[in-house]
Amino acid sequence: MDIKLLPRRLSSDSENSLSISKETQSIRARRHNILVACFLLVVLSFVGISAFLFWTPYSESLRKSTPISHDNAIEGEEQLVEGILEPLALDPWDPQMSLNGLPTAHFRDNLKADVKYITSWPGAGWTNDVMTYANMIYLGFITDRIPVVPMFTPSHINIGATAPVPSLAFGEVFDLPRMRNLTGKAILEWRDVKDTESEAVDDIGCWNIWEAVQYREHYPRRSSAPEHLKLDISYTKAPAWVKLIPDFEHDPHATFWSLARLAFPQALHDNLVTPLPSPLHGTSLPPDTQMLCYDYMYYVCAQQPYEYDTDYSPAWRYVAQYMHWVPSIQNLANIYLNRAFGVPEDEPTPPYIAIHVRHYDFVDQCKVPIEECFATIPVIARRVREMQDQILEEKGIVVNHVIMTSDEKQETWWQEVADQNWSTPDHSRTKELYGDWYPVFIDAAIQSGGIGFVGTEGSTMSIMAKRRVEAWQGGITKMVKWGYVGADDH
């Protein structure tokens, strides 16, 4: 019997599997084709862009117009660089950004209509005036006003001078471009605003703070700065509430925020009294609303009198710590230090401890004989030895150099200093070479540059040196107490 083999019939499940397999292969084929097409497109795009970029005329232009990196740069005028016009990078804190232009004969002609300013005047010794200006600048920061800093006037420097000592611009002592960048704020000098050669007298109204916070002098605080600036001022007495301790005759401090109130329209409107006529023109003017000014701002604090030596002091934290010396003064200080230490002038200054002893006007505060009032050299030497040990322990630095700065005149006292093998800056020709201001500037820079500092309790010069050494050098500081025998025992 013949048997015929017939083709095997697939089940429906097998047919379905075969169909799915064919579809899968078709999908994979399409996906592969798409990927190949994408890859070819990318390659072609890359080739095209490369050809465009490296086409000589365009690539040269692109390279030439690459922006130049500049901190705090903003868009401004254009400059020509290798034939290509570029935006000129400007410093946003440059004085002319806050003014109409170069200094003018009348200060108002240089003020921008949409900008508000603040100023005040010096009225004491140089260090106190430094604090005064820092206070004024801080008040400008919290009232959104641009500080305009006057010059330093030689109220104390003139004493004993053989000829009149000229005033000196703030920016000749402190590095203002650096300060502006560190604070991120615009800070002007009066020489930026008004031409220093101008003989034009400007009328202005200012607040009289001094008469509101003390009860002995019944007039605004006196200063020679307005005369130098050719300003004729009409003063308005500030309200009594600006005083930190109401009706307390032994302290003349105002507070920052009470003075800040007077910078705004409501307090100005509510506290206007009849202004004093100006001394030259006899003009009576209310306090100026664009160039806000106060007669004297040394005695201003946030919370307590004489707070510069506190860790929270806002005038120090936000302003004064950024007031670094101009390079010329710092370089002079380094030269004087190296000479005193017997080190070549072109070598790095070795680590040192600076001392500041103030005697001159503190004599008036002594209630015992002078020889019992001030700390003796052995007492100061004890502080120095303790500081040397502390620096070695905490920083691993051996400090062999100690330098003394002081206003003391007695030769026997200076001989005691020499007997300690301490150095002193040689100021025998400083005034002749650099001017009457420079012994003070060089001493202050020396005091601020050490790894350690020993100062005089209550001296503003010592307080500022102490803060600078701590902030700038990470140094160790001590203040020597005085007033009676054993005052600094510890």
How would you describe each model-predicted region?
Residues 2-68:
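N-terminal signal-anchor transmembrane helix specifying type II single-pass membrane topology
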Residues 74-374, 406:
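Secretory-pathway glycan-assembly enzymes, especially type II membrane glycosyltransferases
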Residues 134-137, 381, 385, 448, ...:
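Amphipathic alpha-helical interaction motifs in eukaryotic regulatory proteins
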Residues 163-170, 411-422, 464, 468:
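Short, aromatic/basic amphipathic alpha-helical patches
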Residues 345-350, 392-399, 473-480:
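Short helix-terminating capping/connector loops at secondary-structure junctions
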Residues 370-390:
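Well-ordered, non-membrane alpha-helical segments in soluble/globular domains
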Residues 388-433:
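Catalytic donor nucleotide-activated moiety binding site of glycosyltransferases and closely related
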Residues 440-487:
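A donor-sugar binding/catalytic signature common to diverse glycosyltransferases
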